[in-house]
Amino acid sequence: MLKGGAPMKYQVFSDMDGVLVNFESGVLKHMNERFQEIANNQEEYKALRGSGSSDYKLYKLARAAARELGGWDVEINKWHIARSDQEGSLGRNKRIRDLMYRLVEDDVHLWANLGWERGGKELWDYIKDIPGLEILSAPMAEGSKLGKKIWVERELGLPVEKVNLSDSKKPYGVWNGKQGLLIDDRDKYVNEFREGGGI
């Protein structure tokens, strides 16, 4: 019985991406739009060569991703940006993932406006009244941190003080003298959390 009656001995944390927030759909939509925009304007991007322009660097990343995909006309899908090594995709899709990070890591607007994960609202409705509930999410760059905080304030109504953004979840396994309980979709972070004493 969690709703409204979670034992106070646990510090409960919920992840965002893949749990409450639909990272995958929003990122794929954004990536494919930008990828096609670059594909349609290659000559303009090529003209920036030697200028030190960040747009030219972006073009080079997109060009490498296009080679990896097998062409500019291939749609980037969830397997291209998979966060785990399902079907050995990490090794095959390195340039595509590099492009993803370049396009989204610092985009405040993107992070602030991602949609809900399927079942995310229902999960939130179930857990939101747990005493002391906090968000624990791994960020990318500074823009992702700000965007995540905006999303949490708007969608969840939580103050930013309840938003923990960290590359490692291990330190949160025991938090404020309580054993932590983490809701997360990624084994990497669940294992880190357990190493820190959490469940």
Question: Language-model segments: what does each one mean?
Answer:
Residues 15, 136-138, 183:
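Short hydrophobic segments within beta-strands
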Residues 128, 194-197:
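Anion (oxyanion) recognition and catalysis
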Residues 21-24, 28-30, 133, 142-146, ...:
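Short catalytic/ligand-binding loop motif for oxyanion handling, primarily in non-cytosolic enzymes
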Residues 4-103, 195:
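Active-site neighborhood of HAD-like aspartate-dependent phosphohydrolases
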Residues 71, 88-135, 142-146:
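Short, acidic loop-to-helix structural element flanking the phosphoryl-transfer center
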Residues 11, 132-134, 181:
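A structural signal for isolated positions on well-ordered beta-strands in alpha/beta enzyme cores
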Residues 163-194:
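Conserved Lys-Pro-Asp/Glu-containing loop-to-beta segment of HAD-superfamily phosphomonoesterases
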Residues 134-145, 149, 154-173:
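A short, structured active-site edge motif that brings together acidic residues
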